[in-house]
Regions:
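Gly/Gly-Pro- and Ser/Thr-rich, intrinsically disordered tail segments characteristic of DNA damage-repair
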Residues: 1-226
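DNA-contacting surface of Y-family translesion DNA polymerases
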Residues: 190, 195-277
Length: 279
């Protein structure tokens, strides 16, 4: 069994740690020179704010609606991330740091002596108590199913941030509710091709013939399908392999024609990529 621990609105939540009065209020984080939005809370999204929105265009209306903005502080974010990962390494013997705000845990020993839902809630509460950071926990027999569980924990508030997919019935139920483009490893191009053959959700993807997947797509997607069926194909990487490249990217909401705005975004994502080197 695996758990995926994922921080909620990581950058915005880091800022809220020191400003508890901002709980449930719109928060955005701006690029290095306050040029555009690079992270935002759920409440800010509900106001219609989007990633890479130019700050000068939205500042007045956003502040009128009670929104708060912070300049990005990558040293702070890296420090809080390190604290969270240290906690996770105390809770599980094997941890894979997947990104600055995500980690996979090996629960093979835990599942023999503790209810996994209880473990997930203990994990959530411990991180909240020791760091002030909100997280969600997805639990499943494979890393891909743990990702599915994390999707459920984010999508459905009634889960209170923890979803355990030990049960096959629960796996099927949630996969039927999960759009195929949300599946870990399904990129935009593959998503379009899958939609073209009538595959709309994760469960429909899991039922495709593996030979068909290998011939029409690739072996990576075939592994994803096998993982959705509960077969472990992707093990934990406790020591990350040497990377030939580090990519941090986002899709702009509209065509960017302002060179200053483009420079702001490139500078910010370069800083994010650099922060990954130190994790």
């Amino acid at each position: 069994m695996f758990a995926l621990v994922d921080c909620n609105s990581f950058y915005a939540s880091c800022e809220r740690v020191f400003r508890p009065d901002l709980k449930n209020k719109p928060v955005v984080v701006l690029s290095n020179n306050d040029g555009c939005v690079v992270a935002l809370s759920k409440e800010a999204k509900n106001l219609g704010i989007k990633m890479c929105d130019p700050w000068f265009k939205i500042e007045k209306e956003y502040k009128q609606k009670g929104g708060i903005a912070f300049s990005s502080n990558y040293e702070l974010y890296a420090d809080i991330s390190s604290r969270i990962m240290d906690i996770l390494e105390q809770l599980s013997p094997r941890v894979e740091i997947y990104s600055i705000d995500e980690a996979f845990l090996d629960l093979s020993g835990v599942s023999n002596c503790l209810d996994l839902d209880i473990f997930g809630r203990d994990c959530l509460e411990t991180i909240k108590k020791w760091t002030g950071m909100p997280v969600r926990v997805g639990i499943g027999p494979t890393k891909t199913l743990a990702k599915v569980a994390s999707f459920g924990a984010k999508k459905y508030p009634q889960t209170n941030g923890v979803v355990d997919l030990s049960s096959k019935d629960r796996q099927i139920k949630l996969m039927k509710l999960m759009p195929v483009e949300e599946v870990w490893g399904v990129g935009r191009k593959i998503h379009r091709h899958l939609n073209g053959i009538g595959i709309k959700n994760a469960y429909e993807l899991s039922q495709l013939d593996l030979n068909f997947i290998r011939s029409k797509f690739n072996i990576v997607l075939a592994k994803t399908v096998r993982e959705l069926r509960g077969e472990v194909c992707i093990d934990l990487e406790e020591e990350a392999p040497t990377k030939k490249q580090i990519v941090v990217s986002r899709t702009f909401n509209s065509r960017i024609t302002n060179l200053k705005m483009l420079h702001e975004a490139v500078s910010d994502y370069a800083a994010r990529a650099l922060s990954l080197i130190h994790i």
